[in-house]
Swiss-Prot record:
It comes from the Bacteria. This is Large ribosomal subunit protein bL17. Transmembrane segments: none annotated. Gene3D superfamilies: Ribosomal protein L17. The lineage of its organism: Bacteria, Pseudomonadati, Gemmatimonadota, Gemmatimonadia, Gemmatimonadales. Keywords: Ribonucleoprotein, Ribosomal protein. GO terms for cellular component: cytosolic large ribosomal subunit. PROSITE patterns: RIBOSOMAL_L17. One of its GO terms (biological process) is translation.
Length: 118
């Protein structure tokens, strides 16, 4: 039975899945929007939103926690210097997912996940 199994496996081990989410989160923070499969985008959304919520506090502890999940120092700096203050008054919902159709090669459903900065 599948009861209480919240996350998608994405056909990866837990270590591979965490590495994938860290890479996607780093790219999203750096670029502001990325295109990936719909399942990965839906799994990435709560991961990134928790990082942004931590960045809103701006504490040293929050910066160290975010450093565990963001691979590049530049992305972590952008998270705390730009995104945290930009979302300071917004109570969650920092990202949006837009479906973009099917991938030509294998028919996978693609989606664009982007930060809502306005």
């Amino acid at each position: 039975m599948r009861h209480r199994k919240a996350n998608r496996q994405l056909r990866r081990t837990s270590e591979q899945r965490l590495a994938l989410l860290r890479n996607l989160a780093t790219s999203l923070i750096e670029q502001g929007a990325i295109e990936t499969t719909e399942a990965k985008a839906k799994e990435l959304r709560p991961f990134v939103e928790k990082l942004i919520t931590k960045a809103r506090t701006g504490t040293l502890h929050a910066r160290r926690l975010a450093g565990k999940h963001v691979h590049k120092r530049e992305a972590a700096d952008k998270l705390f210097q730009e995104l945290g203050p930009a979302f300071a008054t917004r109570p969650g919902g920092y990202t949006r997912i837009l479906k973009t159709g099917h991938r030509k090669g294998d028919g996978a459903e693609m989606a664009r996940i982007e930060l809502i900065l306005s």
